[in-house]
Amino acid sequence: MTGAPIVSARGVTRRFGGLVALDGVDLDVPSGIVQAIIGPNGSGKTTLLNALSGASHADAGSIRIGGAEIFRLKPHRIARLGLSRTFQNIRIFGDLSVLENVKVAAACHVRSSLFDIVVAGARQQATESDIEERARQALDLVGLAHRADDRARELAYAQQRLLEIARALASEPKVMLLDEPAAGMNTAESMTLLETIGKLKARGITILFVEHNVRLVMGISDRIAVLDFGKKIAEGTPSEVQRNPLVIEAYLGRRHRHA
């Protein structure tokens, strides 16, 4: 593994009552790569994303983004350090236009001082122009520029997922977390998503994603970490992970035991 880690987690633990959802997980993600997190249902994948993004704090451990400790920071402060994320459930404003959805996301990450608020004028216009430009660039990258003026609820399901990625991109992140981005997509739609992730990587954005579509994971990932029962049981390149006996047991052994 080359490159300094832009995301570094050590001993991340999360409990829900008597259930240990994450059990001392370590993870290093080098800058600029596509890193997948896979594992059987209930293995702790989304819980780890929640801990990294601040959506749900871990009980113990250390998490760093670009060298800055973010353990127990609020999500908006983590976002300002350059991390954005999407969720399993689509979170868009259906009655707003596609462009307005992305502009709202971009505006949430614009810092304004009291002086900026009081003395608006040209500075405010410049900010609004910048937000619009960033929003349109994000839509262009995900292939939704032609739907900018349509209501978000009019988009097909897969396009709404791409809109979520555009909203996350509008904050100009260094790291993007994607939670099951291909859920509910057919093969053609998944290929479009794969191309979009490739474009994000080409822009230097580090991608960390959870996904059940193994073919997509193997096709786009530089590295894969595998969780099972809250523990990291394997990590490596796609070919290394595919051959790992612990991974084979986690996916196939459990299936045979419950058949």
How would you describe each model-predicted region?
Residues 2-259:
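Glycine-rich phosphate-binding loops of nucleotide-dependent enzymes
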